[in-house]
Design a protein with these regions (language model features):
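SF2 helicase motor core recognition
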Residues: 46-50, 73, 87-111, 115-136
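Conserved Helicase C-terminal RecA-like lobe
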Residues: 1-87, 92-99, 180-198
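Hydrophobic residues at beta-strand termini and immediately following loops
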Residues: 63, 110, 142
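A conserved SF2-helicase RecA2
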Residues: 114-198
Length: 198
């Protein structure tokens, strides 16, 4: 059983380059007096980023599934009212029925799944029809880059992002052609994502 060795290796990593980049970008945006939404998939990432930002003196809050509805509303309103600068959440919790586009125009995607609906819904939290012409809206996609067995650079995050873009193109084509296309299974998604890794 290598569980303890693996745990030690993971703990020895410290802060990843992806997380450093996310924190640095967030700090830059906050210093420009911009509010930021950071999208994650994993609760541990949400909590870790919040703790790191707070240690940097940046006011941040997180909304995750265990947060009661009335508390979600209060936290969202506090974000809109400027009581904190960064909202960290996930699309399972906050991707629908929340409008932040009047106060926030920067979203950082620290983690993302290959569920296109989650991506599109989360993007819509800071961008809506009816925004002022020329309104700035910016999405940032964090990516960890590794070397595969051939020492070629490889990014799982980039593979997931490219898969999402493919799905979006298929969706838009289906809308334009008024014709549904077959959808990919999770197994096909994984096969496409991992094909360049090994």
């Amino acid at each position: 059983d290598y569980a303890n060795e693996v745990k030690t290796l993971i703990e020895d990593i410290g802060i990843t380059s992806k997380k450093k980049e996310c924190l640095s970008l967030t700090e830059k945006l906050v210093n420009e007096n911009k509010k930021v939404v950071i999208w994650c998939i994993f609760v541990d990432s949400i909590r870790s980023i919040k703790a790191s930002l707070e240690s940097m003196g940046i006011k941040a809050e997180c909304i995750i599934g265990e947060v009661a509805l009335e508390d979600r509303i209060a936290l969202t309103n506090a974000f809109k009212d400027g009581k904190y600068d960064v909202l960290i959440t996930n699309p399972h919790t906050l991707a629908e029925s929340v409008s932040l586009h009047h106060v926030c125009h920067d979203a950082i995607y620290y983690e993302y799944s290959y569920n296109l609906v989650h991506l599109l819904q989360s993007k819509d939290r800071i961008h809506r029809l009816g925004l002022k012409e020329g309104q700035y809206t910016q999405y940032y996609y964090m990516q960890a880059v590794f070397k595969n067995q051939f020492l070629d650079e490889f990014s799982m995050d980039e593979e997931v992002y490219l898969r999402l873009k493919d799905k979006e193109e298929i969706m838009l084509k289906a809308i334009d052609d008024n014709e549904l296309e077959p959808v990919y299974t999770p197994e096909q998604d994984l096969e496409l994502i991992f094909k360049n890794l090994f």
